């Protein structure tokens, strides 16, 4: 069957092709049937949709397809019905609780990337993993398959260091300090980061305030081999593409199976050739990982997986019970990170965590003696060497290396919440702070977010400022204020908690 391409200005969220009712009847195709579209050496798989706005002999291609593949208006393509993918039987096997072989996992991942598997089948796969779990051998096979079905980065400068935080703590701009510190010590650290999914700012969102984060693999290779580091958005690259497709479905199901989470993180590291990896697991109330036992178990899994992949992994379990630094939101965090790099001084939680993590990497890379890494990292930060390296990163990625903190625009619609009573700050709700910052417009509105005025343990008087909300519009500010009043993100208590009388 052959048809002419019609470019449609339609986004469906998946790969769909549209045909006319008459062609559907003649070709015996039904809605959601899987078909193969071929033109020359190109071939894609997509689901059928039927619409009377399509002429007979035409095939309409959605923008989802055109964002990944090039087709031109009027181009003639062949359409072939495709049967049930072989990988479906392997998904059923996992649903029964059976262990998958390496080749079966590779087939599933290849079919996800090729779009042979639709969201329904991917949902079944994710649910099967959630219920039955994966062995470490299965996770290793999954990690390698996810990496090898995408692009791989080959950097000549060795050794290649990497750092990754599993997230869950507001204001975690730590890696914007860690990367230039490590690179200034002479090590190689190509850092790919994500945008925010449920947080107020991912590392890529923050760095984008300072410079371009959308680079090609060739550009990354050039920059890293020249200056030893980069800070880029991983989503602009074709690294472990199956990961993005599974995450999209996981979000809808509100599932995050541990095996898939491990493979998701480590597949990106494998794809960029990371040899020494530091995993940061923030732990505490309101973080993704709330207990030390859970953190230790997860740490062991990362280390064991690294061994199977030929990567050396260390894990830092860090305090995650309150935000890092005082700024939450892309521009606010970029400003705080840049100020810290420029002066060598900053919020204690930010400096301590950044130099602590950087110090571990310096020891792993052999440029600092055991037990001296943090001291060396602090010296690099305070000497200005980390700032000079950050300027190089900003310039090489297309930004202004001379950007100053005061040059960064912050949302000018503000509201400050004050203490209703005196006492001590006994808790800061991470999830509430994140929710307020997002309600104010972060991360889409770069200047939106929350500025903390206090931290846990500090004494406050009635009327003292607790948080300032920043927004770029009055409407977003009003919504954030309402939410902040309802959530009460800062908990204040007096030293006397209760008086019990003598009855």
From Swiss-Prot:
Q: Protein name, please?
A: AMP phosphorylase
Q: What does this protein do?
A: Catalyzes the conversion of AMP and phosphate to adenine and ribose 1,5-bisphosphate (R15P). Exhibits phosphorylase activity toward CMP and UMP in addition to AMP. Functions in an archaeal AMP degradation pathway, together with R15P isomerase and RubisCO.
Q: Which sites are catalytic?
A: 256
Single annotated GO MF: 1,4-alpha-oligoglucan phosphorylase activity
Q: PANTHER family in the record, alphabetically?
A: THYMIDINE PHOSPHORYLASE
InterPro entries hit by this protein: AMP_phosphorylase, Asp_de-COase-like_dom_sf, Glycosyl_Trfase_fam3, Glycosyl_Trfase_fam3_N_dom, Glycosyl_Trfase_fam3_N_dom_sf, Nuc_phospho_transferase, PYNP-like_C_sf, PYNP_C
Record organism:
Pyrococcus horikoshii (strain ATCC 700860 / DSM 12428 / JCM 9974 / NBRC 100139 / OT-3)
The reactions it catalyses are: AMP + phosphate = alpha-D-ribose 1,5-bisphosphate + adenine; CMP + phosphate = cytosine + alpha-D-ribose 1,5-bisphosphate; UMP + phosphate = alpha-D-ribose 1,5-bisphosphate + uracil
UniProt-listed Pfam families: Glycos_trans_3N, Glycos_transf_3, PYNP_C
UniProt similarity note: Belongs to the thymidine/pyrimidine-nucleoside phosphorylase family. Type 2 subfamily.
